[in-house]
């Protein structure tokens, strides 16, 4: 049986965050997932404690750590003014399903995923809460991240810079084109998002073929609105024990990654993922979805099928690739000319 307990803590921080005689309008939950995280965990927890708007609860799901992660959490819970709940999985769930479990245990109106090894800027929760308070239709908001070394030194760039997610693309996300943008490729990082708990109605369970952040971003964009916040509110630590890290920036690194990973199995997974998304969208009967979303997912599935054929039938690779280019699918569902060249040479 899984072990769940509430650590010693003060009252809900919603009473501590009163400003100008008014209480915050929302209850805010932090969903923190851990696994052998003792090295950096305390620094992350202390950055949550320094928030100008404290969370109302911290829900920690530990994936059967073998180090002193639980002890670090217990010591922190004994002194912080926030309710801290710790659940230890009896068997390992993996990153995505551990986060899904943490989300399901949260009681707040807003849920903020949290990694075990980053550092939050003090205004992070206040900025995110204000975004949702200002827009009742907003389902998910995400922000940039400043990349830091294992020792906590700034690397000089941000996650969005590495992803080439500039002002034009941010503008598209913020003006109703989030689904089209996120279907092309993911720019939503779990450590840099917040979402309304109501999104879980559509998002859970999370299919095995998706990482939680990409899945939540797509479901939020399909069923509501999404906001990108051009501000690095997290110091995103890069180290060799990370399960998910920042994108590679150098052109050679990108080529090497594509050469190693864009094999037949890659496109089989892409087909599986588009089918999962298509099935889930068809099962959101009470949500008002734009008809274009269904056709876009169907078209991306067709694009993946064609790219898979290129791996199986090398003799017709060139005409297939040229056909996809004329249909504009490399631009809609990939990296444009770069993806076209990959299909010709990889």
Where are these regions (language model features)?
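Nucleotide-sugar donor-binding/catalytic module of glycosyltransferases
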Residues: 7, 13-251
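C-terminal subregions of glycosyltransferases and related glycan-biosynthesis enzymes
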Residues: 182, 208-210, 214-215, 226, ...
